[in-house]
Regions:
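Conserved PLP-enzyme active-site core in the AAT-like
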Residues: 2-324, 330-345, 353-363
Length: 364
């Protein structure tokens, strides 16, 4: 017998709700119900020809109040990369912000699947840039920068809603960017990994910040909002989705048992649970922000408009919190930390984390 002893896990830490990512959260009960219901229904056609996938696609059309094309993929990187590839040729370019997920966190996926379309980073400057947003002027500056054939021709504008800094484009801000895009014959892609949080924050109809505002394709996130896996790629301009199913298959994103990706969406779309979950996550972020605002020496970095809170902490405080088992990301150099709340984040978890930060700051 080995004399090696496996350490007993600290269950308090192991089961603690964390603030690193909304991906840490599990599946909400309603999504789980439909997952298991689909499983209990027995055999069903494969590769998306099942009634579950058709039913959810119709429900999404009802949600957006338009006849859109809907596809399901496993994750957000695939959704963004394949959607952009459908809008671009290899000699085209995509205009985005310096902090866009497609620029910083998708391992070159958009470029790979488009056979080389270049990402053009546009710095809006001022408050917009500080809040992770594009502006109409920033888009036009990039379009007019060069027009010769030695430069990748701008073809798409990509907006992230909510942004990577936890801010939200207003309806008018979206319209301003899309109007400029249309002026220069550009298509508009929306990375909506946290689209639900943006809609809940704005308290608007989902169509008002998508197709009615000039967005051509939306990558609608579900994984961060209570689903087990899967994002929906929604083409409001259906002509742009021609042959998209081939792209999905080629990229290894066509689930043979598609119903297990699509069916859980029913739990989200019925009774607007997708907005309730997102609204709760947003509210928990506001609660955390309110706690942190009272801590001497702690700086809050950007407005909290969705489910993220950004704060500046001394490195000694960061290290102490991490040693205590708290998990969060350092996204900004010099102690800028991101704290994410999820659909299941409890008030008790928020209060405990805030208390830990306050204690660490007091001793710093």
């Amino acid at each position: 017998m080995s004399d090696h002893t496996t350490p007993t896990p600290d269950l308090a830490t192991a089961t603690r709700q964390q603030f690193a990512s909304d991906n840490y959260a599990g599946m909400c009960p309603e999504a789980a119900h439909w997952f298991h219901t689909a499983n209990a229904s027995g055999h069903a056609p494969a590769y998306g020809d099942d009634d579950w996938t058709k039913r959810v696609s119709d429900r999404l059309r009802e949600t957006f109040e338009t006849d859109c094309d809907v596809y399901f993929v496993f994750n957000g990187t695939a959704a963004n990369s394949l959607a952009l590839a459908s809008l671009c040729q290899s000699y085209h370019s995509v205009i985005c912000t310096p902090v866009a997920h497609i620029e910083t966190d998708e391992c070159g996926g958009p470029e790979f699947f488009s056979n080389g379309s270049k990402l053009l980073v546009a710095d809006a400057g001022g408050e917009a840039a500080a809040h992770g947003k594009l502006t109409a002027q920033a888009v036009e500056t990039m379009v007019l920068k060069r027009s010769d054939l030695h430069y990748p021709k701008p073809k798409v504008v990509s907006l992230t809603q909510a942004t990577e800094l936890g801010t939200v484009y207003s309806v008018d801000e979206v319209k301003a960017v899309t109007a400029m895009a249309q002026t220069h014959q550009l298509k508009v892609h929306m990375d909506g990994a946290r689209f639900a949080n943006a809609v809940a924050s704005l308290d608007c109809h989902p169509a008002d910040i998508t197709w009615r505002a000039g967005v051509d394709v939306l990558c609608f996130g579900g994984t961060k909002n209570g689903l087990p896996v899967g994002e929906a790629v929604v083409f409001f301009d259906r002509a742009l989705s021609e042959d998209f199913s081939y792209r999905v298959k080629q990229a290894g994103q066509l689930a043979s048992k598609m119903r297990f990706i699509s069916a859980p969406w029913l739990g989200m779309l019925e009774s607007n649970l997708w907005l309730q979950n997102a609204g709760h996550a947003n509210a928990m972020a506001q609660r955390l922000r309110a706690h942190l605002a009272k801590i001497p020496g702690l700086s809050l970095l950007v407005p909290t408009q969705a489910n993220a809170v950004f704060a500046q902490l001394p490195q000694t405080v960061i290290s102490r919190l991490q040693a205590q088992g708290w998990r969060f990301y350092e996204f900004i150099a010099g102690g800028g930390c991101r704290f994410m709340c999820a659909w299941d984040t409890t008030e008790a978890s928020v209060d405990a984390f805030a208390a830990a930060i306050a204690s660490a700051m007091k001793d710093a």
